[in-house]
Amino acid sequence: MIDPRLQEILPQLASAAAHTHALGFQLEGVEGRRVRMRVPYREDLVGDPETGVLAGGLVTALLDHVGGMAVWVAMNRFATVATLDLRVDYMRAAEPRKDLLAEAECFRLTRSVAFVRAWAFDETTADPVAAAQAAYMLDSDGGRGPGANLKGEES
């Protein structure tokens, strides 16, 4: 079960960063370790004005962010995470003038790294726009502050 404090702040975390707020990221829901987010279609997010298809960079940003949120859900707390590796396979263009959705699930959590799979889609996960696999570095300082894990440092 997800910690009620985390559940309360997840919607704000979906769009707390300047870029996620500007792009309109929204939390759709959490089920188990799976997180779903949405970016409502807007003309200013289009990558190709002739087709109305959303920009590829938007897809990447959404997959990265929903992946990080899946890590928080798996850890059942908010903590600093940093993307170590993000591989995105684009399978098709997003449908013109449709919202973009993404789901992510943290499938392995170690002391220092979390591993995530994610999908971006416009209608169903069975027909993804893109799929991603990512690794995120976890804040492993145990609350001791920056540099606490450096060899020879005293906390």
Regions found by a protein language model. Give the residues of each.
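Active-site helix/loop of acyl-thioester processing domains in fatty-acid/polyketide metabolism
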Residues: 54-77
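HotDog/MaoC-like acyl-thioester-processing domains
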Residues: 1-4, 94-97, 101, 105-155
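Short, solvent-exposed helix-to-loop capping segments enriched in aromatics
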Residues: 7-17, 69-78
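N-terminal structural module
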Residues: 10-32
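A generic structural signal for short beta-strands and their flanking turns/coil linkers
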Residues: 21-23, 33-35, 80-86, 98, ...
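Catalytic strand-loop segment that frames the active site of acyl-thioester-processing enzymes
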Residues: 24-54
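Hydrophobic beta-strand-centered segment that forms part of the acyl-chain substrate-binding groove
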Residues: 70-101, 106
